[in-house]
């Protein structure tokens, strides 16, 4: 058994798609738009991964405050292959004004990682 995809709602579908394309080398499928419900989605595929990220939006979405302290979904983790790549990507995101919540650092359980927010405030863990 394996995870096929994870889906998240976002407010700005196009901006979110471009974020993952630019920083995580995602490839997007053709946008799906259900004219009856207003739902719009992209499936994003990533190099060397079979698991996809589905980003979705609809007109009636409302935001949540303090996402890190809610039950349920906490973060997505991306393995980039080395400590140097963790450092480089984290530095690039911070330079482009995305918020870094921690790291890069070695955690108590031995992982080298940083935690940043994407353009929608979703938490991303960048690991080696």
What are these regions (language model features)?
Residues 9-51, 57:
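Core segments of cupin and vicinal oxygen chelate
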Residues 36, 47, 68-70, 106:
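A generic structural micro-feature
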Residues 1-2, 128:
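Absolute protein N-terminus
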Residues 48-52, 61, 83-86:
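Short, charged/polar surface micro-motifs in flexible loops or helix N-caps
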Residues 17-18, 53, 87, 124:
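Alpha-helical elements of the RecA-like P-loop NTPase motor core of helicases
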Residues 56-62, 128:
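Acetyl-CoA-dependent GNAT
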Residues 3-11, 42, 64-128:
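Vicinal oxygen chelate
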């Amino acid at each position: 058994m394996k995870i096929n995809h994870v889906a998240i709602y976002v407010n700005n579908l196009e901006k979110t798609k471009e974020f993952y394309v630019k920083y995580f080398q995602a490839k997007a499928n053709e946008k799906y738009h259900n004219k009856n419900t207003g739902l719009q989605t992209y499936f994003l595929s990533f190099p060397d991964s079979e698991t996809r990220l589905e980003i979705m939006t609809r007109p009636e979405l409302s935001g949540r405050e303090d996402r890190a302290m809610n039950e349920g979904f906490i973060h997505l983790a991306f393995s980039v292959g080395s400590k140097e790549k963790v450092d480089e990507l984290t530095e690039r995101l911070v330079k482009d004004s995305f918020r870094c919540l921690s790291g890069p650092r070695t955690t108590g359980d031995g992982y080298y990682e940083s935690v940043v927010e994407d353009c929608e405030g979703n938490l991303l863990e960048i690991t080696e």
